[in-house]
């Protein structure tokens, strides 16, 4: 492999290193300590490109400080490429904890140690599918992937800065081969499953769930004494740890999983556990120390032990399947089998994958892996054939999705504390102070809400599309459900209304009942025996008959046990604890969804005179999986009893009842040991009852209020009508006359023909007697209404009757001429005046007074 020509250019905003506590000197020689260049305050240079500016020597760059952006020109196989790099700030969130030990055994803790951010991520210019992972902590080490067929390692020691960079193809690396027993995986999809696990910035702007949300694994790496002796300079050990963590983060990013290094512990004086070449024994010892010593003082999601000790057999690591977030089993042991960080990082990624629920890839083409042979090597393959895996297969993607939907990984949604303040840098995919968003490089930013040049929200945008509480650049309202519950032990989460991110995942606390009383919640999962069988054997699977289960697990062999001892032998269960041992199921699929059937045993048992056919299997999960599939903690094993530590124990040991008593009967305990109050009760102790403010209650109150108003209006109208009726009875016909003038209109009756007096002609107009019910209002023109307003009112009571009957007289003089002003025309559609309805049959008996009657009232002129 020819040596590459390297230059660095385009440096921007390099931050000066912050002072850190002195690191221990573990015995490195003076020459080794002088080999690492000192860090000095860096200087800012103007933007430069290859075509317009001369290259800057790499030695000068590394000796003057590490910039936040770096562009490296590189020749690979005769082709010139430019690496565009940004510091990976998600790798070291906040200021991690460093732990080492003095000769007298005193533990030294540097909480919030200022690690210089010397690791970069990026891509090759002009190659969208490429990626680069590189650390410049001490020299140069990294990985460049142009395509699945072309991958290269970069390496340059701290004392070799004047020499050319060494570039090697992945296929040329000679790493010690390692293998796990082949897992003839039966989960072979018949058709391509949808790719739901894309990187966050490629997601559609839809409501997201646990599958598509970005998860983060808070990782602690523990270096045993043999690893410390291999790298006696503590800074060198720290740099190597950072390089391994960077590759882990790079491997898991396509699965929407980030890896953050929150702590490093170095056993600088002696090993704190008993070391063993048997990885199962070593794992058991390490997990016990993690549970009792490490976890209480340094919270994390997974701990990985790195040792130089050679393991017996071909294995280079071991972990427990589907154990992430478990305080008892979330960890692994790994052998530092190569000077290349790529091989070590790939091995740790393999064991961490087991903790996340990933099984070994099936041989053949059932689990596609990018790249042709011999480059085809995925991380979860049982055997790497001397080539480190660089990618996860589609089978690994589907397995992670299934594990998440089954309730695994509640701790992965809690992001570490905020990072230490650093200078802002637009384009590093981290929202720095002064920025509103950051979607990365211009060619990878797909966020329509974010301006990738300024890292500010675009006009009209309220948020960046980097979380489930932002849709179409608008914040979802407070109370909008952003994460659905995955099982009985999960609680829904809701947007707060002021952030695009969904709150951390909250689950029911340990000991809360679930699955209709079949189990209780443990570590955020509902440990129903039926569901465990269906997760292993598919739909329709059920627990085996009690006699078959007890017989198998009390024998203590590969077909049934309560687990393995540190020496690797199977441990039989006590009869009381049999249900807490190995999973014993019936029905379902012929082949399991996890692992493969290595052997099968059938036996006929007799119980109460009845023969029972029992069948047991020996599942092969791979040599690097420490334990068989045992019943999960929290599985019900009797009335008031659950499995704790593979023993059937009282559920009260989990403390759920004690925690629930703080909620005063109006709530349950969540995973943070806080009360999750029932609706209508206020936290934190669920003692105060809230006012009913739900939409249903509000609607009922409004309906009752409206009904009350209607009742009052009806009562008022009835009272006024009764009062009006009584007044009319007291006043007599005047009330009736006023009703004829101003009462509401009534439907007119049939027209009646008016009677004529004998010897008279038909009168043009007759005066109607006041009707017994009001007449319809007469349409009077406005102009005439104004003239009538000046005239006198009609008499208030009728004229007295005259006993003298008026007799007809001879026809008098002719009628006077009609008025000069024409009468108003009848409204269209109004019946003739003579057809107006009258009371009774319409006949009119006229009584004439003895003296001439006064002229008709002014109002009657309307009818002349």
Curated annotation (Swiss-Prot):
It is a single-pass type I membrane protein. It is found in: Endomembrane system; Cell junction, Adherens junction; Cell projection, Cilium, Flagellum; Cytoplasmic vesicle, Secretory vesicle, Acrosome. Residues 826-850 have a biased composition (Low complexity). Residues 215-416 form the Peptidase M12B domain. It is an enzyme of class 3 (hydrolase). Residues 768-780, 810-825 have a biased composition (Pro residues). Residues 17-49, 738-864 are annotated as: Disordered. GO terms for molecular function: immunoglobulin receptor binding; integrin binding; metal ion binding; metalloendopeptidase activity; metallopeptidase activity; SH3 domain binding. Residues 34-49, 753-765 have a biased composition (Polar residues). The modification Phosphotyrosine is found at residues 717, 737. Its main location: membrane. Binds 1 zinc ion per subunit. A motif (SH3-binding) lies at residues 816-822, 851-857. Interacts with ITAGV-ITGB3 (vitronectin receptor). Interacts with SH3GL2 and SNX9; this interaction occurs preferentially with ADAM15 precursor, rather than the processed form, suggesting it occurs in a secretory pathway compartment prior to the medial Golgi. Interacts with ITAG9-ITGB1. Interacts specifically with Src family protein-tyrosine kinases (PTKs). Interacts with SH3PXD2A. Interacts with ITAGV-ITGB1. Interacts with GRB2, HCK, ITSN1, ITSN2, LYN, MAPK1, MAPK3, NCF1, NCK1, nephrocystin, PTK6, SNX33, LCK and SRC. Active metalloproteinase with gelatinolytic and collagenolytic activity. Plays a role in the wound healing process. Mediates both heterotypic intraepithelial cell/T-cell interactions and homotypic T-cell aggregation. Inhibits beta-1 integrin-mediated cell adhesion and migration of airway smooth muscle cells. Suppresses cell motility on or towards fibronectin possibly by driving alpha-v/beta-1 integrin (ITAGV-ITGB1) cell surface expression via ERK1/2 inactivation. Cleaves E-cadherin in response to growth factor deprivation. Plays a role in glomerular cell migration. PANTHER family: ADAM A DISINTEGRIN AND METALLOPROTEASE DOMAIN, DISINTEGRIN AND METALLOPROTEINASE DOMAIN-CONTAINING PROTEIN 15. This is Disintegrin and metalloproteinase domain-containing protein 15.
């Amino acid at each position: 492999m020819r040596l590459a020509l390297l230059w660095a250019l385009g440096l921007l905003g390099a931050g000066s290193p912050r002072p850190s506590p002195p690191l221990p000197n573990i015995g490195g020689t003076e020459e080794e300590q002088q080999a690492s260049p000192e860090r000095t305050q860096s200087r800012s240079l103007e933007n430069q490109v290859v075509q317009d500016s001369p290259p800057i020597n790499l030695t000068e760059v590394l000796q003057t400080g590490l910039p936040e952006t770096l562009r490296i020109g590189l020749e690979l196989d005769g082709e010139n490429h430019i690496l565009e790099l940004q510091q990976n700030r998600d790798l070291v969130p906040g200021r991690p904890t460093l732990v080492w030990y003095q000769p007298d055994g005193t533990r030294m803790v540097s909480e919030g140690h200022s690690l210089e951010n010397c690791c970069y991520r990026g891509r090759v210019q002009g190659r969208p599918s490429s990626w680069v992972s590189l650390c410049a902590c001490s020299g140069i080490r990294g990985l460049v992937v142009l395509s699945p067929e072309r991958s290269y390692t970069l390496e340059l020691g701290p004392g070799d800065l004047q020499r050319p960079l060494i570039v090697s193809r992945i296929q040329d690396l000679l790493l010690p081969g390692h293998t796990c027993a082949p897992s003839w995986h039966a989960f072979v999809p018949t058709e391509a499953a949808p790719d739901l696990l894309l990187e966050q910035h490629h997601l559609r702007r839809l409501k997201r769930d646990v599958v598509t949300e970005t998860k983060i694994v808070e990782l602690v790496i523990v270096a045993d004494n043999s690893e410390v002796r291999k790298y006696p300079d503590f800074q060198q050990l720290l740099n190597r740890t950072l390089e391994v963590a960077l590759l882990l983060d790079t491997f898991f990013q396509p699965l929407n999983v980030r890896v953050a290094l929150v702590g490093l512990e170095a056993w600088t004086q002696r090993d704190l556990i008993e070391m063993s070449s048997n990885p199962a024994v070593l794992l058991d010892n390490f997990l016990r120390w993690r549970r009792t010593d490490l976890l209480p003082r340094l919270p994390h999601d997974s701990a990985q032990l790195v040792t130089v000790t050679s393991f017996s057999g071909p294995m280079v690591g071991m972990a427990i399947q589907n154990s992430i977030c478990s305080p008892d089993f979330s960890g692994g042991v790994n052998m530092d089998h190569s000077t290349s960080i790529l091989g070590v990082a790939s091995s740790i990624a393999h064991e961490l994958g087991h903790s996340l629920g990933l099984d070994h890839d099936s041989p053949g083409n059932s689990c596609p892996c990018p790249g042709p042979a011999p480059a085809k090597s995925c991380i979860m393959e049982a055997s790497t054939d001397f080539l480190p895996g660089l990618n996860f297969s589609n089978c690994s993607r589907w397995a992670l999705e299934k594990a998440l939907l089954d309730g695994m990984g509640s701790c992965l949604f809690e992001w570490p504390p905020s990072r230490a303040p650093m200078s802002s840098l637009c384009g590093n995919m981290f929202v720095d102070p002064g920025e509103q968003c950051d979607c990365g490089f211009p060619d990878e930013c797909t966020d329509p809400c974010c301006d990738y040049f300024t890292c500010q929200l675009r006009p009209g945008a309220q948020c960046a599309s980097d979380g489930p509480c932002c849709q179409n650049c608008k914040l979802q309202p407070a109370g909008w459900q952003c994460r659905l519950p995955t099982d009985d032990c999960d609680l829904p989460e809701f947007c707060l209304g002021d952030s695009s991110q969904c709150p951390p995942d909250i689950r029911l606390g340990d000991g809360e009942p679930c699955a209709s009383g079949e189990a209780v919640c443990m570590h955020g999962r509902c440990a129903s025996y039926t569901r465990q069988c269906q997760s292993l054997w598919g739909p329709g699977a059920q627990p085996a008959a009690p006699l078959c289960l007890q017989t198998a697990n009390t024998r203590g062999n590969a077909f049934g046990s309560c687990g393995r001892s540190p020496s690797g032998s199977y441990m039989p269960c006590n009869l009381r604890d049999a249900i807490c041992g190995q999973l014993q199921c019936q029905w379902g699929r012929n082949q399991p969804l996890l692992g493969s059937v290595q052997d099968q045993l059938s036996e006929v048992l007799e119980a109460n005179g009845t023969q029972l056919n029992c069948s047991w299997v020996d599942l092969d999960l791979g040599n690097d999986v420490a334990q068989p599939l045992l019943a999960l903690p929290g599985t019900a094993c009797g009335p008031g009893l659950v499995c704790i530590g593979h023993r059937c124990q009282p559920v009260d040991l989990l403390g759920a009842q004690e925690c629930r008593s703080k909620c005063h009967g109006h709530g349950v305990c969540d995973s943070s040991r806080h009360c999750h109050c029932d609706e209508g009760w206020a936290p934190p102790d669920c003692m105060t009852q809230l006012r009913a403010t739900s939409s249903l209650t509000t609607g009922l109150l409004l309906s009752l209020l409206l009904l009350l108003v209607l009742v009052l209006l009806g009562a008022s109208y009835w009272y006024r009508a009764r009062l009006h009726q009584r007044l009319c009875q007291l006043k007599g016909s005047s009330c009736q006359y006023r009703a004829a003038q101003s009462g509401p209109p009534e439907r007119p009756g049939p027209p009646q023909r008016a009677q004529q007096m004998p010897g008279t002609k038909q009168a043009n107009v007759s005066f109607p007697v006041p009707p017994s019910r009001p007449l319809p209002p007469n349409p009077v023109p406005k102009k005439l209404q104004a003239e009538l307003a000046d005239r006198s009112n009609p008499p208030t009571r009728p004229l007295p009757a005259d006993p003298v009957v008026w007799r007809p007289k001879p026809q008098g003089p002719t009628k006077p001429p009609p008025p000069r002003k024409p009468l108003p025309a009848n409204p269209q559609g109004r019946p003739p005046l003579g057809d107006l309805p009258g009371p009774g049959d319409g006949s009119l008996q006229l009584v004439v007074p003895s003296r001439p009657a006064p002229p008709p009232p002014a109002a009657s002129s309307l009818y002349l």
